[in-house]
């Protein structure tokens, strides 16, 4: 016998959608936008680390 909790009752509607697929493209475009933003973030971090992107008063001296 399962224990019924208030949190379980609140989350039950989310679980009832399990296995269903949204019609059409669904949220794929939103995922694509976030992937591009994450890629841009990684490129900026890489450029700062590689000193390709110079920022005022930002030192990339790892020795101290």
Swiss-Prot record:
Pfam family, one: PsbH
Primary location class: plastid
GO molecular function: phosphate ion binding
Membrane topology summary: Single-pass membrane protein
Disulfide cross-links: none
Annotated localization: Plastid, Chloroplast thylakoid membrane
Keywords linked to the UniProt accession: Chloroplast, Membrane, Photosynthesis, Photosystem II, Plastid, Thylakoid, Transmembrane, Transmembrane helix
GO CC annotations, alphabetized: chloroplast thylakoid membrane; photosystem II
GO biological process: photosynthesis; protein stabilization
Transmembrane segments: 29-49
PANTHER family in UniProt: PHOTOSYSTEM II REACTION CENTER PROTEIN H
Family in the record: Belongs to the PsbH family.
Annotated function: One of the components of the core complex of photosystem II (PSII), required for its stability and/or assembly. PSII is a light-driven water:plastoquinone oxidoreductase that uses light energy to abstract electrons from H(2)O, generating O(2) and a proton gradient subsequently used for ATP formation. It consists of a core antenna complex that captures photons, and an electron transfer chain that converts photonic excitation into a charge separation.
Subunit structure: PSII is composed of 1 copy each of membrane proteins PsbA, PsbB, PsbC, PsbD, PsbE, PsbF, PsbH, PsbI, PsbJ, PsbK, PsbL, PsbM, PsbT, PsbX, PsbY, PsbZ, Psb30/Ycf12, at least 3 peripheral proteins of the oxygen-evolving complex and a large number of cofactors. It forms dimeric complexes.
Protein name per its UniProtKB record: Photosystem II reaction center protein H
């Amino acid at each position: 016998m399962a224990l019924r909790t208030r949190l379980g009752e609140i989350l039950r509607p989310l679980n009832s959608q399990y296995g269903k697929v949204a019609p059409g493209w669904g949220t794929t475009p939103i995922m694509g936008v976030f992937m591009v933003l994450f890629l841009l973030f990684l490129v900026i971090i890489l450029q700062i680390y590689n000193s390709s992107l110079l920022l005022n008063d930002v030192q990339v001296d790892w020795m101290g």
